[in-house]
Amino acid sequence: DCKILIIEKEQKIGMHGSGRNSGVLHSGIYYPPHTLKAKFCAEGSRLMTNYCKEYKLPILKCGKVILPTKRQDYDQVDLLYERGTINGASVEIISQKELLEIEPEANPAIERALYSPNTSVVDSFAVLNKIQFELINLGVKILFNEEVILANPDQSTVKTNRGSSFKYAHLINCTGQYSDRVSKFFNVGKQYTLLPFKGLYYGLHKNSNIQINGLIYPTPDLSMPFLGVHSVRLVDGSVYFGPTAIPAFGRENYQGLKGVNIKDATSISYHLLRQYAGNKQGFRSYAHQELHKLFKSEFLKSMQKLVPRLSDSNL
C-alpha cells in the first residue's frame, strides 16, 4: 500500500529517453506562440534551471546560435526571433561580426543569425538521480524490473510481467516509446502507432583544433519534428555533432541490430512505407536527406554548412 507508485520495467532509471538525450534546455524559440508546447518549453526551462541551481546540479550556460545555411532561411531567422520574443525567450538577431565573436568556427559567409544567450545544458543523469532521491524521501515507491503487460480499466487495475497486480485511483502513462501500446490498454489512441526514430552522434576529438563554445544549430524545417544536425557542448566540456533522425526498427534499437525483433520491425517497415508512399509533409524527400547522413561523408557535409573547418579527422 502506498500513495504514489512508479512501475519501472528496467533495473534502474534513465535507460531510455530520460537518460538518452543531450540535456539541452530549449527556451521556446521554435514553437508557435500561445501553444502548450511553447508555454511548457519556456516554463520548463526556467524551472529546470532554478532546480539545478538550487541543488547545485551541473548546468552549463553556453548559449545557442541558429544559422541560416540557405538564402531563403533568413526569413526563418526573423520568424524564430518573433516566436522566441513572444514566448518569453531571451533572443537577439546578431551580425556576422557578432556571430564570429561568439563562435569563431561558425560559417563566416552567414550575414546574420539568431542568438539565444541563456540556452543551457544539464547533466540528465544528475537530474534523474536527484529526483529519484527526493521522491524516495517523500515516500514514493519505485518498483524496478516490473513491466505493465495488461490493464483492466473497469476495475482500475494493472498487471505486470512478474504477476503483480495493482489497483489505482489515478494512472499516468509515461512509458515513452511504449506509450501508444499502454494507451490502447485503456481504449485510448487506437488509431495511432508510434514510429521510433533514433539519432546518431559523432564526437569531436579532444585534441582537435576546432573550438566550439556552445550550441550551433541550423534554421530548422518547421514542418518536421527534427532540428537538423548541430553541435552540442555537454557539461563536462565534450562536444558532439548530430543527431541524425533515422528510423529505428525496434523501440529500443539504439545500436546495430540490438533491440530489433521481427514483429516490431515488420510493423514499423509497413508504416514507414505508407508514409513514404503518401509523402505527407514532404516525408519522402526528408527520408532521402536523412538516409544520406548514414554515410559519414554526407553527415560531414551537413555539419560543414555550420562549421566549415570541420574535417573527417576531427570526428
For the regions a protein language model found, what residue spans apply to each?
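A short small-residue
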Residues: 22-30, 278-283
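Dinucleotide-binding Rossmann-like beta1-alpha1 core, especially the glycine-rich loop
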Residues: 24-98, 102, 111, 229, ...
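Short loop/edge segments at beta-strand edges and connector loops
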Residues: 8, 61, 95-96, 144-146, ...
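Glycine-rich FAD pyrophosphate-binding loop
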Residues: 2-20
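Flavin-binding catalytic cores
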Residues: 189-191, 207-209, 234-238, 244-315
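Helical element adjacent to the flavin cofactor pocket in flavoenzyme catalytic cores
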Residues: 113-170, 174-181
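Short beta-strand to alpha-helix junction loop
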Residues: 32-43, 67-76, 114-134, 143, ...
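Flavin-dependent oxidoreductases
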Residues: 151-262
